Every structure is written in structure tokens, then in C-alpha cells.
Amino acid sequence: DSKSAVQVLTPVIFKEDRSSYDIVKKVWKDSIVNEKNFERKWEKILHEGIYTKPLLSSQKVRTQNKISTAVLNKDQTLDDNKFEIIFTPSSSVYDGRYANNGWLQEIPKPITSLTWDNAAFVSMKVAKKLNIKNGQMIEISLGNASVKVPAWIVPGQNQKTITLELGYGREFSGRIGSGVGFNVYPLRTSSNMGYAMNADIKTLNETYPLASTQEHYGLEEDKLAAPGFSDLSTNEVQSRIPDLVKQSTLEKYKKHPEFVQDIVEEHKPDKSRSWADHSMYNPEPEYDYSKGHQWGMSIDLTSCTSCNACSIACQSENNIPVVGKQQVMNGREMHWIRIDNYFSGDPDNPEVSTQSVACVHCELAPCEQVCPVGATTHSTDGVNQMTYNRCLGTRYCANNCPYKVRKFNFYNYTRDLPEVVQMAMNPDVSMRFRGVMEKCTYCYQRVSEARIKADNENRDLVDGDIKVACAQSCPADAIKFGDINDPNSEVSKAKRRNRDYALLGQLGTSPRTTYLAKIRNQNPKLSSNNHQGAHH
């Protein structure tokens, strides 16, 4: 019979041996239920399994502003040519506790789209004044401490504030997290846990490569260069941003609820003529998409917070590999879902719009028309599917995809994975190999699982049987997935709303994934009316 540590130490402390029951009872009597009639209360606690402390009597409290006044009277003066430092936990690795997680290291951060590193966020005005470029090393000094960290120019950053992300630069984090990023904790003391005043900034004559996905897979026709707005307010950009992220204010939406249809004309293709008529192959039989289960998705841009939960859930569900910083810098990240960031208006106080983009499963998919081996085809239930062992890696499909959502395996990223890591992979999803194209599949393995379960139970599929990974993980419930032929499904209800629109609808691809336009409910005193220039 073994004994717990408490039972072993009890004879030493109390000079007598006690049972576990007596030890627990004594602790409750002395420390928790220090009341009269303990034996009766003890029996009640054992019977009910819960103990409710008696309510405290109400007390009159007089507020004293001594502490708050002392804080407010603390020296808050910001000297000229000095900066305020803001310490913030990383949106990816928090305070460093998740630094050894490759998924979180490689996920692009909101607004900056940085991966695998932290940086000092500076404003455009400061960057111009100090001649700072993205990735240029700067030295931040505060008191007797100083750190060297690369700079990153962020629209909307206060010109007197430098933001530093915590959680990086750990030396013993693990195989993935050790040595990633820069340790800024030396500047953070017990007296300035959240922010610090009067820091000095010194520009260094050295640079550090930062991996940002901001300019990857952009939907604009022109290659736009971050970080400034100086040359970005072109007619081309201004005309395309409202088409991609359709939005309005609540006040304008109430007056004109059909505003989505006025922004750009959506072309409805003539489905009586099939693209297969012009193919060198025998045309496949036409499918009647008005019958049977037809899968579709709706994404509400008003609800979406660009938190990246959908992208991480997709990576976990579909065995998407981590490729590393260098491959991200080469534009070869493998995420099936990306978050596009758009900035408009005043660079010092821009309006930020975000959009979650994955394969939209076009009914008339441009990718299917150019594949020489038929590796990407359409299913009878409206899903654009990939046959991996048929793919030759020509990448014609990626070139012809207007949404830029297809990802190519330049290497066999999973070949050298240890067996124990392979056991953590989803067995319902195929592992891809070098030379193969991949993309969102609408979590078809979950569709098949739900269909098999319904067949075994001798019933039809009902709305809610299928939860794709992105919709399941979305904390804002911004993603709806289901049968668009079911008028009572959540996705059908969403698509009937007057805010529904198709991304790049003017191309006539009939995407199954559509969006609900973003509605802003801004305080009129805080909103800006000058949101003309635009930048991705």
C-alpha cells in the first residue's frame, strides 16, 4: 500500500499518523469552513459535493483617489525626439509560451502579415524622418538597457510610439522556437510592464530579413510596394479595392441596402453553353446543380476579426506542412486560407479592411480548363477537387486562378517527419508530395464522414451535420457552410441576404463561396471621411 506525500509528512509534522480522511477533514475545519457546527456542515458538504460560502454583509465604501492620483501625477512627459514604447504579447506566441509551435510561428500576424519574427513597429512619418526601411535594424535604449531589433513600418502607428512584441528571442524554447526573433524583455521592468516613456531610437547600418506575406497572392493587377501610400493612390487600386472588399456604413446601408449590386456588375455566365464544348477531350456529362446536395459557403466580413483561427484549424485538419522562414520569403507558404489586409485613407489613420480568402470552388472554374491531365475536376455536388496522384505539377491551374489560392509543393515537406509526428496527422486526409498542387477541399473528408453516418442511420443529411474546420473554429461564427439547395440551411439564408456578393464576380466564375459585405458602425466623431487612397 503506497502513501501520498502528505501522509508521509504527517507523522513528521504532527508526531502522529493520521488517515487521509482525517487530514482532509482537518484542513477543511481549520482553513475553509471555520464555523460553528462544523460536523453538521461537514456531513452536508460530503453529501452535496459542494460548499457555498456565506454571503458577506454589505459595506459602505468610500473611494480614495490617492493611488490613481499618484499614477496620473507620475512623470508622463514625453521629451522631444524621444519615443513611447508599448509592450504587447504576440498574437502568435503570446508571451513566448507557444514559441515552439511551428503553426503559430508561421501564421501571418494580423495587419503586418509578419511570420517567424517580431519587429519594432514604427509609423510612416518616423520611418521617413529617420530614413528607416523595412527590416532595418534599430537600437532602442531605455535607461541602462538597450535592444537591437528590426523595424517594420505599419500604417496607423502613432508617430511617437514604438510597439514591441514579447515572446521572441528565447534561447531554450525547443527545436522550432529557439533563437527565433528578438528578446525585448530587457527593456521591460516591473515599473513599466505595459509601456515605457522616453526611449531613444538609433538607426543602425545593417538589415535583417523579415518574412511577410502582405504582398503574396495579391488580387491587384499591379505589384504594389509596401510600406507607403505615396505612389499607391492610383486609379487602378482605388477602383479595385471596393470591388474586392465591399463595405458601407450602417447609416448608408439603412438608406441604400442594395449598395452591393451598385459597386461592380457581376456577370452571370450562360450555363447553357459548356466550356467543355471547346475542349480537346470528350466532354463530361453536365450536372444539374439544382438537384441533390450542393455545397457552398458564406463569409461575413462584418463578423470576421481576422484572428487566423480558421487558417490554423485548416492547417491542423488537412495536414498542411510548415515550410520555414526562407520558403515563406520565397512566397511558398502552404496555407489554404489567407487573410488579405487592405488599408485606405490617411496613412497615419487608415481604415483597415481584411478578407479571408480560400478556394471559392467556382462552378465554371478557370483552373479546370487548363489542366492537361484532368487533375482538378468538379464533383457532382459542386466541389472543385484535386486528384493528387494525377497531378504533373505544370502549375497552369495556379496561373489561371484569379483568386490565387492554389499552393504548390516545391519540396517533399513531410518525407522526413518522425514516425511519432506522422501519427499525429489526420488519417482521413492524403499526404501530398513534391510537385503536387493543393488547395481548399471544403473538408471533403468531413462531408464523406457525415454522409456515411447518415446512411448508416438511414436518414438524410440535415443542416449542421457537416462542420468544416474553418467554420467550426471561427469564434465570431462568421463562416457558414452547408447545402445551398436547402432553403432552410444557414448558408442559404446567408446567401439570400442583400449583402451577399461574389469575389471578382465580374469574371463569371460562379464561385460557391461568397461574402457578406462589411458594415461599419462608426462613431461619427471618430470616423474619417477621407478614405480615397487604397493599399494592399
Describe the function of each predicted region.
Residues G435-H536:
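Long, compositionally biased charged/polar accessory segments in the mid-to-C-terminal portions
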